[in-house]
């Protein structure tokens, strides 16, 4: 067998199947586009669902890809096994109703055994098949010539995820020899068993049945092929190394970890776990961020945060106690650059994100340890066992490996309730598995739409009306020849001016009519074969297939949509100009009455930045720039500087919307002919939608004017109420009112202090001596939570060597504050005092050794909490 680099294996695979008439499908971003069922692209076939379910027809029925993927259902196994990964590449060849078992098996055998390709020794290959799949058996045995002893029948060789396509599969195994798997059970020592000797290198799925709702199976009219070969595993076989982590995909990362940690890989099993965790997770994190994901507290962002924190925790076992993961990004970029240049192109941005996350986690790590210490105290006082749910929360929220929790617990003479912990883990796995199965289920779209292939030409770029013919009617999921008034129907036209929802732009609305009927069009979408599919309600008459009709778009809405779409392009360019090139579109909505634009950026925009962006857009509007739209090949478009939206896929011919020099962008939407038609642009809000993603909402034209007019009316009302005549006087008057308010509040605060002081009497007389300390513990009557802190400041100035603890009832809520002279904080800590008191009033709190505060919801227990804290100090 040839010894090949991973990049060479990838290229050979693609080249082989191109020779066999396959179309290369580029690797899609890890963040799914137009697929809300997936958290991540998790397999090679995930990006091809649109072809398998009929939403789109591929240029060729034969497809090959090398798809990057993320799976996080087994995170806890990564690092402890030879081949578990969260990020991996899946090589795959696919047939959409073209070739089937014969060719799929022959292709696989040729690629693996031919000296031109992988050059594997045929006598080291074994296969598994489903017991009832005699067709696959005969191909392997009679056509390929594989001995019967190397064809293993396994009941589990059937790909089935519930309703939808399913079928038997055949897996190909490579025998690595007797040196491998010596510690594995003898009963598992066969291809398909749990062992290290026989490695599965390729899985061929023969999708030939439909799994029906009643659990029966019927043959599919079009049979498909779906195969998968893990690049990392094939590299380990080709390079003859024990695990995936010793291939050229990982070893440069391992070498860098060795330099930083001063530890060696493959010397100590416990240390090796940390090496593998770090190397795996940095690949996942770097690629996910390069594809638009960012750390967050939910969704895919939470997965990234959890992976990064897990890697940081394991790095500490190697003695690395400072941010360093970000330094590995350049190495990942260098390894993967030949096929994935995106990581290198965005390396600076990726490193900034990772470094920021690392710094934050090192800060919060102390909090996690503090929580664990509290759990230990709680366990010592009760069962001598840390609650499993608490341990799981520590693991899941703070990224603490359970091994670390157990280790610290053992040092404290405790156990961890692993039964409950494992139960929580299993529930999480079950949720992940269910989500994965749901996401993989391919819903076959209506065969009616899939079988309609007649052309429907969009003419709406040039006109909002058209004389055309109604060619197809779909009612209640069936194609019909006529529909009566009052019904909702889907239909197609030979030519249509109606834009179908796409690229963030909403669909046109309007009417389709003739003398006999009228349809009010409410939605337009793309059918599986690319036609515009209209939805509408029949207003009157009887609609018939073949009717000649007039199609008219609502032109007022169309004009407003055009303005908003062109303004969105200007906004995108302005954001890049003001904030930086890291800004990428993360979503958009272009409607008639407004526009919404989501983009990647670290934090909230300042008012000055918003003003700059708004002015830039308006300046381009007022320049009256002609909007030139051309169709050209993708290479020419990029050469002229056209901006392609991140994550979008484009065909060979693209449409360029040119507002040069400010904005040149690839876009299929409808636009104004000159920027002056937009009239006016006004940002009405800027907000966050998630970690690292901001959202701008804006108005144009008449809507922007009406918005400003409304603001002016409110401003005039305010002037009237303030009794000022000119606009300039408003700010002066407002400042005057604010100053007066501050003065009154200060007077009120002073009066509150005086009242409290009168009620308290001589506080020196209330100081007690407890356990050798001067202590003032009392309830105070104050009007608000701020006043208790002010009262504390007064008491501290008078009692500088005294421990002071105050509590108050403000609006049926407890406020507490404690101070300890700094000379005493080695023995008594204010934070501890509040933490002891707070639970008694059903609250919580904490703070520094010299000052702490807290609150609670049971003011009836204030006296009890004050008595308790006196006893607590007495027993220190």
Curated annotation (Swiss-Prot):
Subcellular localization, as worded in the UniProt entry: Cytoplasm
Keyword Nucleotide-binding (UniProt): yes
The protein's required cofactors: Zn(2+)
Reaction catalyzed: tRNA(Ala) + L-alanine + ATP = L-alanyl-tRNA(Ala) + AMP + diphosphate
EC class: ligase
Single GO molecular function: aminoacyl-tRNA deacylase activity
Xref: InterPro entries: aa-tRNA-synth_II/BPL/LPL, Ala-tRNA-lgiase_IIc, Ala-tRNA-ligase_IIc_anticod-bd, Ala-tRNA-synth_IIc_core, Ala-tRNA-synth_IIc_N, Ala-tRNA_ligase, Ala_tRNA_ligase_euk/bac, DHHA1_dom
SUPFAM superfamilies in the cross-refs: Class II aaRS and biotin synthetases, Putative anticodon-binding domain of alanyl-tRNA synthetase (AlaRS), ThrRS/AlaRS common domain, Translation proteins
Residues binding Zn(2+), per UniProt: 565, 569, 667, 671
Keyword RNA-binding tagged: yes
PROSITE patterns from the UniProt entry: AA_TRNA_LIGASE_II_ALA
GO terms for biological process, alphabetical: alanyl-tRNA aminoacylation
GO CC annotations, alphabetized: cytosol
Functional summary from the UniProt entry: Catalyzes the attachment of alanine to tRNA(Ala) in a two-step reaction: alanine is first activated by ATP to form Ala-AMP and then transferred to the acceptor end of tRNA(Ala). Also edits incorrectly charged Ser-tRNA(Ala) and Gly-tRNA(Ala) via its editing domain.
Entry text on domains: Consists of three domains; the N-terminal catalytic domain, the editing domain and the C-terminal C-Ala domain. The editing domain removes incorrectly charged amino acids, while the C-Ala domain, along with tRNA(Ala), serves as a bridge to cooperatively bring together the editing and aminoacylation centers thus stimulating deacylation of misacylated tRNAs.
Family listed: Belongs to the class-II aminoacyl-tRNA synthetase family.
Protein name: Alanine--tRNA ligase
Lineage: Bacteria, Bacillati, Bacillota, Bacilli, Bacillales
Name of the coding gene: alaS
